[in-house]
Amino acid sequence: MIVLSSAPSLGPLLALGALRSPFKKPSAGADFPRARLVLASLRPDLRKLAAYERVCGFATGDDGLPVTYPHVLGFPLAMRLMSGRDFPLPLLGLVHTSIEIVRHAELPGDGTYEISVHIEKLSPHRRGTEATVVTEVRVADDVVWESRSTYLARHRTETAPADGPREQERAPLPAVEEWRIAGDVGRRYGAASGDRNPIHLHPLTARLFGFPRAIAHGMWTVARCLAAHGAPERARVTAEFRAPVLLPGTVTYAEDDAGRFELRDGDRVHVEGRVERLGPGPLQGRPGSVPLPGDQ
């Protein structure tokens, strides 16, 4: 365990990770850093929190943190691990493919938290290698929030794992509303979250990485969906990132009574996920889920 006195600055970490990327040799069998980085006492910056709530569509001034906000608090620690010399995957081109969030209790916006981040594993993927990054938020000794994010480094594989069963095509979820996303969403979210990856900021910088225009942050798309959908105090949220959202753009938000949600543009799904209410149980651990209203 490595205890940090303050959160690392994301800008230098992004630059360092970019410089080291050409020298990485990604492989699912490679060794990876086992250290757990810890911020022992962190209080959210209420000004940045309010900016985050505004850009993502959450109500401002609520007592509790949005369900996605602890990811922002832990992201600098994750970036320090993934930009390090001993992390085998190149930071440039690393794609956030999914996230699972478990919130065991509401987190007050004015609370003080211990944040810890570690890399759980590397896994073979048909398109390369995937890293699983775990973030945990504690109050005293209790885990009150945790997440698992997967990040994919695309590269040629000698023996790609066999494809699993094909997903059954399902009908699109019922459309709820259409959203017009402004071209500055990436810059506004970057200012609120600290994640100023150039692919999100401007068409010119996005073109350097092969995108015709700037793209929205994946975690902004999930947060925006959850601001519309809502989440119980004790909840499990899962989301998979399917395709980038170009900025500016128009997308359709859709959901059903079973807790599923998606963001799509015509037949193209950008993100899909589900919200489940967790039953009563101890803070630490993974209590079972119970259906949301409409699941019966």
Predicted regions and their residues:
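Catalytic-pocket segment enriched in acidic/His residues
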Residues: 204-272
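Hot-dog-fold acyl-thioester-processing enzymes
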Residues: 1-98, 158-231
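HotDog/MaoC-like acyl-thioester-processing domains
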Residues: 1-31, 76-79, 97-181, 244-247, ...
